[in-house]
């Protein structure tokens, strides 16, 4: 048969079909997909001249000597960790994780957690204390052969993850598994248009609760599992720390109908002149210039374009993506100058920190503007002259009418950092002196917020609030609502609601004007975090809470200074919107996180932070007929350098008609993240008790469903069956119920609870899981390679993780417990003097003070290793998240101050405590309910 014209490749002779073409069908000339050349194929001829100019761009690309979608397969087997996925011929299992004492099975080397430790380290003082038994987990997991064809799976379909049942009661959970990657996403061969290992979205940007999607809503309902995405569009505070590919030629190809962006999962047709949308199937023209490098004036190799090789890309947006010129970065600081702010040292520390961070505030385009309003019972505005003016002194204007605070000349109140740099420094030096003798206890912060809204409303920007008082006069004034008698009762939930409707309605006004609010709260008394946190919640901001903060304690001052400096340096996005599109049949139904839901599917962010994650629930509205679905997140934003950009994240997932596939590919940490957001919503809507009950009911429902549908209804030998990839879920649910934000207790101050709820609904997934189930390391007997750099990577090696139970604590031990916000260094009551000497520099434990502190830098190997472990445990960047938080370290003695000890012990979520059950009781309760 003669080759078709135009140099188009002949149909396959080996029986492999181009995707989208029925088996054995003759090639449909204009509608057959076009594939990239095989890896390493030489580029074919340059542009053909003399024809129409429109096609000169594309002339180079499509004369390959090999069949469409030839053996390279469109997907590398076992692609890179960034987002590649294997496409193996055999059923792909998600193998059970090896436990101590279990016959070895290959597993990622980095997770060799739970190995028996050597005899090194600090041993017990005498024979009286047997070393803790690390594990009695010996049962080999049943590696079930699924035998033949999976029910509900089409013959010849790609084999998805295999289901490995495990008995939850027979072996304790290896907590290192909480850091494991999710079950792999297994796509059919040739699912993507290029064989790039980064063609599918990395789990650090987007995680799905289900890595195999049910084709029908009835199957999803039958599974009782949630279908949701956990989205973290930015994974670092600064672009340089985690760069993504940038498409800067302003050629953005989008589907005419559904407005999806071209991505690695589209199909090219008509000799590459058109592309078929993988969301809605519409055929679109490839834009002019798609294969042309305008800068170099030469043809481009289409298959090298970032948007066809990378699931995460950023497009530089042309003019039509702007309603107005890109917004400059604006920070208006509302600083509390009342008596409590001055006496705790907040005013002085904040002023000094802003001054020392001026060089870190993004200002590449030299348009960044700053303003300052000081707040007590009046509002104090400051005009700062330009550098080089006759007078460098700032002038202050005091406004006492809080009902209608008029604005002095706005132009002088919001000044350009570049033009007024020196005079801003002079002002910040003087600010503290202006109020050092104040006795004013009033706080008109609500009125200050309104004034700030008026001031920056025309341009938008950040209102950064630093306050150590409860707003008690003017707009939005709040009262002391906390009543210790109602803590732990059903009435407590009302204290978690806002105490003044001003904060919600004002937040919505801010969102409309592209104003975002961040709250830094420092009170040693009740401050009504529940009300104040509404401002960040609806404006894309965050609430940072520093209870009992005082600058006289260097630990407090240094923690805030580091965090606030990183906050100011963060390369936030401005005037942003987020939208998630998906394959026909799927719909985004509910959105969770700090933003304003402007329409059914559009989330508005006056500022887009870099240290938060969002959860989007997905509904299946109609039967999905495709073998692969795609979900594409787009964030349109202005960078803080004044460039309009669109960050696009495309996730492709296989579909299935089999319930076993759905369970085998479910991601336990993404599911826990989804239910964390649901629990916060339930708490604020219905109450704490209802939120806890809903969590318990949900885990019972999942266990019962699995037993009934997939375990044949059996409860063998008193066990409790669940898939091995979900075996941490009952523990995570218990830990969530016992978290500071949700647990039943009469001891938790309302502000602490409200601040915890803010974290539970904003933290990126790795930090949220750690906040729910903290990390504990045994330091006194850590292996020799722990606390020192790994020779291969240079990264500090952490000791093996321990389960959070007092059974793991030996009386002579030293342990680090870290929930990502706070670190506890637990010193056992019988710690040997040498250990205390090496770590703390005291010959006797009685001299060791407890409470927040920095570890001394001592000249011995063990002290260095302990400090390295503490530091590495704070290294969020290596875990693919941006965060300004520097966890505070508390030294706790087992026989020391009871309040501190109880706080540290509340992290041991597997123990019975306060009004919470132990893990053992919890598992017995679940089993009882499941077999009822």
Curated annotation (Swiss-Prot):
InterPro entries: ADF-H/Gelsolin-like_dom_sf (IPR029006), Gelsolin-like_dom (IPR007123), Gelsolin-like_dom_sf (IPR036180), Sec23/24_helical_dom (IPR006900), Sec23/24_helical_dom_sf (IPR036175), Sec23/24_trunk_dom (IPR006896), Sec23_24_beta_S (IPR012990), SEC23_SEC24_subfamily (IPR050550). Disulfide bonds: none annotated. Residues 1-58, 81-109 are annotated as: Disordered. Keywords: Cytoplasm, Cytoplasmic vesicle, Endoplasmic reticulum, ER-Golgi transport, Golgi apparatus, Membrane, Metal-binding, Protein transport, Transport, Zinc. It is a peripheral membrane protein. Transmembrane segments: none annotated. It is found in: Cytoplasm; Cytoplasmic vesicle, COPII-coated vesicle membrane; Endoplasmic reticulum membrane; Golgi apparatus membrane. Its main location: cytoplasm. One of its GO terms (cellular component) is endoplasmic reticulum exit site. Residues 255-280 are annotated as: Zinc finger-like. One of its GO terms (biological process) is COPII-coated vesicle cargo loading. Zn(2+) binds at residues 255, 258, 277, 280. Pfam families: Gelsolin, Sec23_BS, Sec23_helical, Sec23_trunk, zf-Sec23_Sec24. Residues 15-28 have a biased composition (Low complexity). Residues 86-106 have a biased composition (Pro residues). One of its GO terms (molecular function) is zinc ion binding. SUPFAM superfamilies: beta-sandwich domain of Sec23/24 (SSF81995), C-terminal, gelsolin-like domain of Sec23/24 (SSF82754), Helical domain of Sec23/24 (SSF81811), vWA-like (SSF53300), Zn-finger domain of Sec23/24 (SSF82919). Belongs to the SEC23/SEC24 family. SEC24 subfamily. Component of the coat protein complex II (COPII) which promotes the formation of transport vesicles from the endoplasmic reticulum (ER). The coat has two main functions, the physical deformation of the endoplasmic reticulum membrane into vesicles and the selection of cargo molecules. The COPII coat is composed of at least 5 proteins: the SEC23/24 complex, the SEC13/31 complex, and the protein SAR1. Golgi apparatus membrane; Peripheral membrane protein; Cytoplasmic side. This is Protein transport protein SEC24.
